[in-house]
């Protein structure tokens, strides 16, 4: 357990909390949870933060794609930015996906987003409602403003896909 090695670029300003004393867990939660309040947005019932990456934009050092359920529990994806990885500015509007064939791009629901940087693009995967069934949606962005939707991956009936660089 003492031989952990993190592969990737250093992130010296990433928030970190040491493992609690006497804990043997591989992963542990921040003692300040929840980091993002469930009702941060005017219409949100709950917000889930599973897709954050380092991203420099003005005062911000991090960008993320968040599942934000509204008060009718409609699952939507929203973009957020943070200077410190703890205090987040999440945009009120949900992500608008561009470029997909209308049959693929019709929004039903989306949840459990993941983001990975591959070369000069950030790829987002999420559980995408496609004709009422779950599949893996895929889109890319280079600025966290415009998202280009690609074909759904692994039809039918898949969810929680992730790309590894």
Residue ranges: model-predicted function:
Residues 1-108, 116-165:
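Beta-rich carbohydrate-recognition and catalytic domains
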């Amino acid at each position: 357990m003492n031989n952990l090695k993190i592969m990737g670029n250093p992130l010296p300003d990433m928030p970190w909390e040491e493992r609690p004393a006497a804990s043997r867990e591989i992963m542990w939660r921040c003692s300040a949870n929840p980091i993002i309040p469930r009702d941060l947005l005017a219409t949100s019932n709950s917000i889930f933060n599973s897709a954050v990456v380092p991203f420099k934009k003005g005062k911000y050092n991090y960008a993320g794609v968040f599942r934000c359920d509204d008060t009718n529990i409609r699952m939507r994806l929203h973009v957020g930015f943070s200077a410190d990885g703890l205090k987040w500015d999440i945009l009120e509007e949900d992500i608008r996906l561009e470029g997909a064939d209308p049959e693929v791009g019709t929004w039903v629901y989306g949840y459990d987003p993941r983001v990975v940087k591959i070369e000069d693009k950030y790829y987002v995967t999420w559980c995408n409602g496609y004709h009422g069934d779950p599949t893996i949606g895929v889109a890319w962005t280079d600025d966290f403003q415009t998202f280009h939707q690609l074909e759904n991956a692994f039809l039918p009936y898949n969810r929680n896909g992730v790309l590894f660089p």
